Swiss-Prot record:
It comes from the Eukaryota. This is Myosin-7. Transmembrane segments: none annotated. Residues 780-809 form the IQ domain. The lineage of its organism: Eukaryota, Metazoa, Chordata, Craniata, Vertebrata. The modification N6,N6,N6-trimethyllysine is found at residue 128. Myosins are actin-based motor molecules with ATPase activity essential for muscle contraction. Forms regular bipolar thick filaments that, together with actin thin filaments, constitute the fundamental contractile unit of skeletal and cardiac muscle. Muscle myosin is a hexameric protein that consists of 2 heavy chain subunits (MHC), 2 alkali light chain subunits (MLC) and 2 regulatory light chain subunits (MLC-2). Interacts with ECPAS. Interacts (via C-terminus) with LRRC39. Residues 84-777 form the Myosin motor domain. Residues 1914-1934 are annotated as: Disordered. One of its GO terms (biological process) is cardiac muscle contraction. GO terms for molecular function: actin filament binding; ATP binding; calmodulin binding; microfilament motor activity. The gene is MYH7. Its main location: cytoplasm. ATP binds at residues 177-184.
Amino acid sequence: MADREMAAFGAAAFLRKSEKERLEAQTRPFDLKKDVFVPDDKEEFVKAKIVSREGGKVTAETENGKTVTVKEDQVMQQNPPKFDKIEDMAMLTFLHEPAVLYNLKDGYASWMIYTYSGLFCVTVNPYKWLPVYNAEVVAAYRGKKRSEAPAHIFSISDNAYQYMLTDRENQSILITGESGAGKTVNTKRVIQYFAVIAAIGDRSKKDQTPGKGTLEDQIIQANPALEAFGNAKTVRNDNSSRFGKFIRIHFGATGKLASADIETYLLEKSRVIFQLKAERDYHIFYQILSNKKPELLDMLLITNNPYDYAFIPQGETTVASIDDSEELMATDSAFDVLGFTSEEKNSIYKLTGAIMHFGNMKFKQKQREEQADRDGTEEEDKSAYLMGLNSADLLKGMCHPRVKVGNEYVTKGQNVQQVSYAIGALAKSVYEKMFNWMVTRINATLETKQPRQYFIGVLDIAGFEIFDFNSFEQLCINFTNEKLQQFFNHHMFVLEQEEYKKEGIEWTFIDFGMDLQACIDLIEKPMRIMSILEEECMFPKATDMTFKAKLYDNHLGKSNNFQKPRNVKGKQEAHFSLVHYAGTVDYNILGWLQKNKDPLNETVVGLYQKSSLKLLSNLFANYAGADAPVDKGKGKAKKGSSFQTVSVLHRENLNKLMTNLRSTHPHFVRCIIPNETKSPGVMDNPLVMHQLRCNGVLEGIRICRKGFPNRILYGDFRQRYRILNPAAIPEGQFIDSRKGAEKLLSSLDIDHNQYKFGHTKVFFKAGLLGLLEEMRDERLSRIITRIQAQSRGLLSRMEFKKLLERRDSLLVIQWNIRAFMGVKNWPWMKLYFKIKPLLKSAETEKEMATMKEEFGRVKDALEKSEARRKELEEKMVSLLQEKNDLQLQVQAEQDNLADAEERCDQLIKNKIQLEAKVKEMTERLEDEEEMNAELTAKKRKLEDECSELKRDIDDLELTLAKVEKDKHATENKVKNLTEEMAGLDEIIAKLTKEKKALQEAHQQALDDLQAEEDKVNTLTKSKVKLEQQVDDLEGSLEQEKKVRMDLERAKRKLEGDLKLTQESIMDLENDKQQLDEKLKKKDFELNALNARIEDEQALGSQLQKKLKELQARIEELEEELEAERTARAKVEKLRSDLSRELEEISERLEEAGGATSVQIEMNKKREAEFQKMRRDLEEATLQHEATAAALRKKHADSVAELGEQIDNLQRVKQKLEKEKSEFKLELDDVTSNMEQIIKAKANLEKMCRTLEDQMNEHRSKAEETQRSVNDLTSQRAKLQTENGELSRQLDEKEALISQLTRGKLTYTQQLEDLKRQLEEEVKAKNTLAHALQSARHDCDLLREQYEEETEAKAELQCVLSKANSEVAQWRTKYETDAIQRTEELEEAKKKLAQRLQDAEEAVEAVNAKCSSLEKTKHRLQNEIEDLMVDVERSNAAAAALDKKQRNFDKILAEWKQKYEESQSELESSQKEARSLSTELFKLKNAYEESLEHLETFKRENKNLQEEISDLTEQLGSTGKSIHELEKIRKQLEAEKMELQSALEEAEASLEHEEGNILRAQLEFNQIKAEIERKLAEKDEEMEQAKRNHLRVVDSLQTSLDAETRSRNEALRVKKKMEGDLNEMEIQLSHANRMAAEAQKQVKSLQSLLKDTQIQLDDAVRANDDLKENIAIVERRNNLLQAELEELRAVVEQTERSRKLAEQELIETSERVQLLHSQNTSLINQKKKMDADLSQLQTEVEEAVQECRNAEEKAKKAITDAAMMAEELKKEQDTSAHLERMKKNMEQTIKDLQHRLDEAEQIALKGGKKQLQKLEARVRELENELEAEQKRNAESVKGMRKSERRIKELTYQTEEDRKNLLRLQDLVDKLQLKVKAYKRQAEEAEEQANTNLSKFRKVQHELDEAEERADIAESQVNKLRAKSRDIGAKGLNEE
């Protein structure tokens, strides 16, 4: 494009190089071999010149004068200077990183910020305003192709717009790049461009409401509103978008703006409460504080100082490039233009102000408590006022939130840190939800009621991020970019490769999009990073470190993209690394779980939902907390809101975005940030290289290098490069452009692999085009120097020639002047000079007179023509008016037709939506039915559990009552003991009285007493030991008490769970009611759909009426056109008259001798006017004809379209009715299944009850043992008290030894009673152990049953494997039979594989382009319907064929009976049968293989189809494959027919060969003909014929003996005759078809017979030889008859084998059915096993629950024991008091010396026995305790074993389930094979029918052969007679 053309763009200097620059670049010195790029540490790459090359290394001098030495492979060549600042980098000769970098750098230095790189555009941020976006530039780019204009964002936008209009396809523009690269600005420019070129014009202004702008204004003003709340200052960018957006701009059918909508992604909500130092919060906060609108500050109760609010001044508060006050007014006016009400605006401002006040809330820690308390209420009151809340409730919710524990709400205390975190989370949530609400509100405004056809989506999203500290947000952004890059790769490189295929270049398709699939799968697939993160979020005890451990366990060392990072000192710690396409990124996982869960204070959220501020309550209206029930109506796939994590939401949004993008034609824009200092014109090479790698620009170049990036049309190539070798393309003769290019390239010294020839272009590898350019430049330089030399010589010669001519002319002039000077004064010459003027004046006067006359005549004619012209003009005006009226009418009709088309389109869309809704409703109905069944089952289960828990509660209450009774008994015992102590006190008083009397005796017994005291000391030591043992026992008792306390807690927990289950049952009942209501609604909706279909039918009839009206209108228009044509004919006549008159006038003028200049000009004007009128008339007629033709065509098209739509609607109605009936049937099936399930459940419940009864019995026994243990503990306490009392009595009162002995006897009795009780308890324990063993035995029995069932299943699997092996044997058998045609089958296989591969590629293309799927969807549905019809027909045909098969079997039996004795022709049918059977088996194998391929194809299709319904896709794909298989089958049938024809030819040849045994054939044919008429008669005729033949044989044998000499000669004659007979046979076969030919053949045979007669005359002796030969033939005949008998036996054997094969086929089908039934029984058994397993699990859970209950009871008993221990301590205190009294009274014991001596022996004996008993008792108790502990440990072990066993059972069930699935697959395959066998049987039947027809044909041919043989025999007889006559004559003559 020249500079003159570029001037239209206004800013040419910023868009493209000038011509001067281009010329300078071409003349700049450049050496292709020396000018290179070398790597550099600072600048990445620098330009250099090669100095030398040595040993694989290169020494080069850089531009800076620095000499470097690098490896040769690191050196990269520079492009020629003419490629500098090239607009499309894909056209560079050398495509590599430095070339791209320097091309961008040079362009950026000249402020050319836009560059193409193949299919996408690269833009660099200029950091300054450039005049490239004004209205002049917009107008220049409008309607321009990409190649016609310089690179620009407007060019991308206009191309997208033009593609949308021409291709009728949605478009998208993907703008990506890092923060500060200019994404937002380019997005604005794209929207600005569309708003200008596609403005809806006057109509939008008419529709404009006061206070609101036009649609294009609203689209433009949506940006300021979103930027105020979504943009902020960052380190790199003052106006950085902190969210991604996808703006869809919708257009009508004519390309006018219709509406728009916006989707947003990944808002950075953490910025609301935290900013880095060099950054700041969202713009809206600072705009409000700018004090531009003071009323806002008053309304929000804030100041204009940002430092007064904690959330917003953490970084910077002002930005030099942004005026916050002006931006506030822009935001406010944008709200007005977008139609926000004042209430909505104020609500937004209030919530923003409330967030600022949130940051100022202060809390303090309460003293001595971990509880936060408010520190002032001013900010809380302000924020509560702005949010429409109660301040006290808000504070209470912050400090004391309510948490749901079980079924109850509990108030939880919060510390200061927790409260501040909750405030931040609430502020972020409010801001995020407010931003999302704003987006939906803007979308509602941009949604107009105008019809919309297509849209262009603009995606502005953050680019790839690699920071020092990368967290969860970076993972989400990088994952998004990974998906987008994969989409970009697929689109770009698939298009590139499609062009190669289109051009016919040999190219193996490379799917570059899969390069990134490993990383994408690592992030999003199940058990990968995202799913593990979501799983960890569900566990309460999970932490970031457990998340890290799971990641390492699952992926470290298993995935190449997952790596362990290298932590560097001074940098943030990294936990794992991911290898992305842009580089390896280290991620830090701290806080990921919290970020993903994003929890909120639900108490405060509840307040928000009740807020008086309408906007706030709406924002949180749909919020459901962690304790809220899951919404069942949305199906199982939806999780509850508690599990709607950030990662899940992000993936859902990303999947929606990708589906949107896949349905469009994408255009890519890559934005690049040149430097981080925001300096204009400066480019930081390493930064730009990093972005180029991240943006995929270099990736695109890498893939581009694999292909052919440079391509030129053949004509252009020939024109441009013919100069390289003109001799290759001769000048004189015509040569095609392609052939010329081929010849030219082959003549050059170039590697042929570097270029390829397409259909229209020649393709070059990267670098070759630059080489050609260099060669062309060299050639041009040589040619130009030669031309310059020649031109200089030519110019000098021309100059010399001019000098010579000038000299000659000067000589001539000189000669003439000299001559004139000689005659000048001559008198006659003077006279001549005077007379010459007078002669001309007379002639001029005559001419003037004639011209005046002519002028008068012309003037009159002119006046007449003027009047005529005026009349014609008036008529023309009237005609033009009529034409305009007609055009208006046509326009109105076109508008009506367009409206009708739009309505039809809307109807089609409604139909599609209805179908989708019906599918959704059916799916939801199925899901709800499943949920209903599950809920009913859960409800019943919970009811059973409730009843069990109630029983447990009753049992616990009984045990409590018993315990209370025991407690009362112990209290009574304590009272009795206190009374006994009082009695002892009285005894002590009496003893004090006796003390005085005994003092004297005491003095004497002191010595003896000392000895006794020593003994007592030993006793006290033994007592201490016993007490220690007692303490140990008490410790064990305390442990038992703790266990009992735990059991009590578990019991309380169970009670809470019971309440929860009851509540959940209530909820489930409510859900059930809701489901019933939804079912009713669905019925109502179905009725509504039927009504809607009827309405659509009515609408169709209305459209038909309208069509009739339009037809009538068109007929009227045609009549008007006819009238206009007649008028046009009249005008044509007038025009011809005028032209005649004009010609006459012109002739007159010519006769008059010409006219004046005025008349000539008038004539010219009139002619021009007449020509103009003529042209106008012709144009008008052409326009009328064109409009009429267009109207007719449009009418026909509209009629056809409306008819198709009506047919489609009728089909839809029928389909809906079918689906309705199918749904009803499915409902009936579901109800029957439900009844069966209910019955099975009732049986299971009965079994559960029996087991529960047994468990209750065991439980009661366990409780009895517990009670006995409690009794033992109480008795042990009593023993301890008694032991203390005994010791005290021994020490204090020796006088009361007799009483102690009595007490001892009572205690011994009590001990014996205790022993008896212990023995009873041991017995009870033994019984319990027996019961436990029996229960274990039952469990073992159940386990054995389960193992038996598994063994049975294994046996079934063995049977199935045997069946499979049999099938495999059959297959191998068939394969061995089919060896003869393996090559053909392999070819068929290859064809099939190729077709399947093509189908797979088609499926991939379909997956990649969902839009094309949408178009083909209707066609596929029609094909499916046709297939269904074909299937029904084939079923009917199959039934008919079954009937034919039975009839055919009968016919075969009859034919077999008829032709058992004589069928020599069956040999051919046997061969045919063999070949057909082999073909059948081959077809069968091929069909089985095709079925296997079909199955694999189905599975792949299921995986690939995500959004289109699986059913339609599978049917479509199977339909395609079935069509292909039918084609293959037809091909194979054609081959079979060819083989049959070949067999027929073989049969014919066999007939020729059997000419030797004509008599045997004659006999056979006679027998066969007789069987057809009457078997009996033919038998008789055969016998007579045999007798005749025997007579002839006898006569011939008699003559044989005499004629032995001439045998050799007769043999020769016989051979000759056989040849003649063969010729006759051939002629006779032709005689069947044509009678005339038959007669000719008879004549030829007669002539041949005459010849043979002459030969026989010559050789009389040959007759006898012939007779001898005939005898030999008779013998051969006999032999052949024997062979025929053998062949019949073989045929019978083959028939039997065929029947056996059929029988085996039937048996295999029966086996398949048996296997199917076994499979169903296995499935039922599996269901039973699952039910048993679930029952066992429930039982185990109940046992565990009972153990917990028992533990709780034990804990309760321990508490009671603790109380009793306290009472014991009190008693011990009293005993200590008594001991003190004893010490005081020891002095009084002297008097009791004598009694002490007596009592000494008794005391010693009794004490020892008592001690021995106590020790024995202690040992028994210890043994019992150890046994009890052992039992407890065993029970724990048993529990663990049972748990392990349960896990094993679950694993086994899972394996069984998998095996069953495999069995199901096998059964399905077998069923498919059975169907294939059925089809093959049908095909065999068809083949049998064809064989039967062939047999009849052969039979007919045999009849004809019989006739021919009869004729031949008669002729032979004649010959014999003649020969005999001749022989007789010869004998007579002799």
